[in-house]
Amino acid sequence: ANHEGFDKAAEEGANIINIHHSKPLNPVINYPFYVRDSLVNFVEHEHSLGRKVKLYYTIRELTNYAAEIHALRSLGHEIFVSGVGYGLPWHCEHLIDDYKPAWYVELPGGKADAALVLNGFSRWINYYLEGLRWMFENYKIDGIYMDDVSFDRPVMKRIRRIIEKYR
């Protein structure tokens, strides 16, 4: 189960892989629940070779593939940041206005990952942390990769407790 040259990197001594979003194993941003089976199989394969796997998972934005997106919008601006809207085609068709568009990438089959900016200080943190706990328990990941962290110390301590419990 090669991941874009990781087997070659492993030959040179690499033993940890970061699975970023917008890649076949993790196609949409911050919603790795969408591709459970392929991730589980990949992590098991890498572990069998003595390698570790970290998964991209932040709280900055959320894909339009999230099943919860319309329920979260019903909470006003608590979860999604307010904005002009009228962003990408998916946004215009399904949300129209009053949101701030974020990450966008075209996916195979003419689909797109069209994320929305999240408010990082809301009840969504609890949902995010439960998702993190679930991934450690069910995917058996070894860690997460975050390229933007806006968590306060208490949230980082909660993240640490989750990681320490499962790894």
Language model regions located:
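Hydrophobic faces of well-ordered beta-strands that scaffold small-molecule active sites
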Residues: 1, 17-19, 53-57, 144-146
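Catalytic domains of carbohydrate-active enzymes, especially glycoside hydrolases
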Residues: 2-25, 138-139
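Conserved structured core elements
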Residues: 3, 28-29, 33-40, 122-129, ...
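Acidic (Asp/Glu)-rich catalytic clusters
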Residues: 6-13, 40-50, 136
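Active-site beta-loop-alpha junctions enriched in small/polar residues
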Residues: 22-24, 58-62, 149-151
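Aromatic-lined substrate-binding rim segments of carbohydrate-active enzymes
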Residues: 23-55, 155-164
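Active-site-adjacent "subsite" loops/lids of carbohydrate-active enzymes
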Residues: 44, 55-139
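Active-site and adjacent substrate-binding regions of carbohydrate-active enzymes
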Residues: 46, 120-167
